[in-house]
């Protein structure tokens, strides 16, 4: 039975039960704090009373942690704890005065300790799960837009709370914990993550498991990607699937509606170094898919995603210049293009041109566009860059690119990317134009194919000239 209550009294404009001792009183406060005017006029004494109830109820949880047989007696305490957290959570909404009052009572430390106790219980009770969720919601709200509260939350919660909750089986607990981490992180605290990489990896895993949850995604895109040091340290410890997840977010950042700022560009140049080196080290992993065509090799899929990132990076004019002079990158791209082109000709495999659509789950679908993206990357690297134009010629890359122009369902838009690459290879480069013109004269390049691609060969005296017409397909 609920303890008897004194008649309600008015405190600073809010009708509250006095003293606050029972569940009904807490529920009344929770409802009152849904209104902004009530939050703004709440006296600090209310939060002291709520904290007293929270501390008293915590003893039952501590006892259950020491003696599992006591878990069945937790129901009433969990109800009170839940309502305390709801009350405090609501009180903090867009009200820095209440956030400060609650923080100064050391309620944050009590709440974090209690949440960690919940994780220790490891029992399946809906009431426990609800209290757990409400506790995390309170910590998120008390820290929201309040730097002092964020600092206190970080002191108490890092690293134990994040280690305990980011991998919790309940998706709401993962989401609320991610909200706390997102709210509390800043440049200085990112250094703490570098020393606790498992937390950063858990965030990647959380996004992988719960892609619909916005908080893990925002942590990665808005915090992790601003720290090249963290990304590099973390990348080496990620599983292949986690690497794919991270690279997908890098792509999302590159192609997003918001353009990269100057600060972003300097950071992404560092990321570009990691991506380019990783691709150069692993690019031949795609060949594993030819020996085991029914196996989804994650290493190969990472290589495919690395190429996708490089294509998007070189589509950004601010990042292009850095990658155009990246040592060994062009050579490696030409090398892997030549290898998969030859492998595709030798026997029927996933790199052979196909005129039939594949089911989404097929491994052919996983490698879709790889060859055309290699040609796209070559075209990007040659954009207004004579050194790279000449390098492709020296590596016999021009015949290779022209020979890759067959229609291929595994490589949509192959023709368009070949045209794009040829255009960038020959722009203001008479030597490369001569190479293609002579290939046509010698029968090594199909004139009808060149015309279809938007080029034609004209004779001027003893010279052959490659010209583009107005019907060049768009890239």
Curated annotation (Swiss-Prot):
InterPro entries: ARM-like (IPR011989), ARM-type_fold (IPR016024), Ataxin-10/CTR86_families (IPR051374), Ataxin-10_domain (IPR019156). In high cell density areas; cerebellar cortex, dentate gyrus, hippocampus, anterior olfactory nucleus, primary olfactory cortex. The modification Phosphothreonine is found at residue 82. Keywords: Cell cycle, Cell division, Cell projection, Cytoplasm, Cytoskeleton, Methylation, Phosphoprotein, Ubl conjugation. Disruption phenotype: Embryonic lethal; mutant embryos display gross morphological cardiac abnormalities or developmental delay, the walls of the heart are thinned with an apparent reduction in trabeculation. Mutant embryos also display neural tube defects with a thinned appearance which may result from a lack of cell proliferation. The modification Omega-N-methylarginine is found at residue 10. It comes from the Eukaryota. The keyword Amino-acid biosynthesis does not apply. GO terms for biological process: cell division; cilium assembly; neuron projection development; regulation of cytokinesis. May play a role in the regulation of cytokinesis. May play a role in signaling by stimulating protein glycosylation. Induces neuritogenesis by activating the Ras-MAP kinase pathway and is necessary for the survival of cerebellar neurons. Does not appear to play a major role in ciliogenesis. Belongs to the ataxin-10 family. This is Ataxin-10. It comes from Mus musculus (Mouse).
